[in-house]
C-alpha cells in the first residue's frame, strides 16, 4: 500500500535527519545536494517506483539511475528506509570498509542500479 501525503512528509523529515547525521559522523560529504533531492527520491521510492527490497534483482523492477553520485547519502537513506539494508548502517558512511562510500558502487550494496561519480555520467547509463 502506498503512503499518503502525511506519511511521505514524515519520511522526508527522517531522511533529512539521516543525511545530517551521516555527513556529520563522516566529517565530509555533500549534505546540500543530498538535502535538495529528498522529496524527489522519497516520492519515487515510496509512491511511484515498483521495487522489492526482498528481491533487489527482480527483473521487472523500476530502475533508478543516480547521475550525481556525490548525493549518495540521500539514496542510501531512502534505500535503508525502504528495507534494503539496516538503517543503523547509515552511520558508516565513508568509513573504512563501509559499503556506503562517497559515490555509490552498485556491486557493494543491494538496490543500486548504477555506480556513479562524474556529473552527467548517468545520462549515458540510462
Regions found by a protein language model. Give the residues of each.
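A broad, low-specificity signal for short, low-complexity segments enriched in glycine/proline
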Residues: 1-3, 27-28, 88-90
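Histidine-centered catalytic micro-motifs
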Residues: 31
Amino acid at each position: 500500500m502506498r503512503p499518503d501525503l502525511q506519511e511521505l512528509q514524515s519520511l522526508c523529515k527522517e531522511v533529512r535527519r539521516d543525511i545530517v547525521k551521516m555527513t556529520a559522523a563522516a566529517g565530509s560529504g555533500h549534505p546540500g545536494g543530498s538535502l535538495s533531492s529528498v522529496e524527489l527520491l522519497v516520492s519515487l521510492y515510496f509512491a511511484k517506483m515498483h521495487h522489492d527490497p526482498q528481491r533487489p534483482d527482480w527483473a521487472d523492477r523500476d530502475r533508478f539511475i543516480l547521475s550525481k553520485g556525490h548525493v549518495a547519502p540521500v539514496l542510501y537513506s531512502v534505500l535503508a528506509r525502504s528495507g534494503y539494508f539496516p538503517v543503523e548502517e547509515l552511520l558508516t558512511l565513508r568509513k573504512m570498509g563501509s559499503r556506503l562510500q562517497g559515490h555509490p558502487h552498485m556491486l557493494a550494496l543491494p538496490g543500486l542500479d548504477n555506480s556513479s561519480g562524474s556529473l552527467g555520467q548517468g545520462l549515458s547509463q540510462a
